[in-house]
């Protein structure tokens, strides 16, 4: 098997260059509702950039340096913006019934990202390294033990740090790339009011 040929054929089969890097959009995309997906994506970019800076200088420097405090706050507030945007995003997509015409993959993939982002957020709060986070980790571990997931030790700071900065971050990045690929491949769903009218 030739991997490059396989990739070439798969990309060519599913996406043109205009799909991948569109220069035009349907008129109905000129609506404020479409801003929420972009806002989610932008806040995620800020989360990743500030998170990489936080992780770069070790697990606690953000508690005792002014640059660390600032970066930590940027990371925290980007997460707040992310959750507000993603909630508005999927609410808008729900009222547009954006899963229509085979877009169920984007819809299911979106819920997967959302579910993983909850675990990512929880693991983030456990990295505060204070009494509050220790209390939460201690209380939360019983729920995981009850689910048979006791191998995930939420009381171990290093495990939680790795889960947060490697495991969940990687899953979210991969699923977001898939999300955007599906959107580019399928194009934005048509408004409900116009459905079927063009064919008559
Ligand atoms: C990290 C989280 C997410 C990011 C970065 C993201 C980003 C985007 C972007 C940029 C678009 C294209 C622009 C737009 O239509 O607004 C889009 C479309 C879409 N998203 Fe998301 N999204 C996320 C989570 C979700 C969730 C949780 C759902 C629902 C459960 C969802 C469902 C959809 C659907 C169905 C579309 C296609 C809309 C259409 O065809 O018009 N997304 N997303």
Show the residue positions of the predicted features.
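Membrane-embedded alpha-helical bundles that constitute the cytochrome b-like, heme-associated redox core
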Residues: 1-200
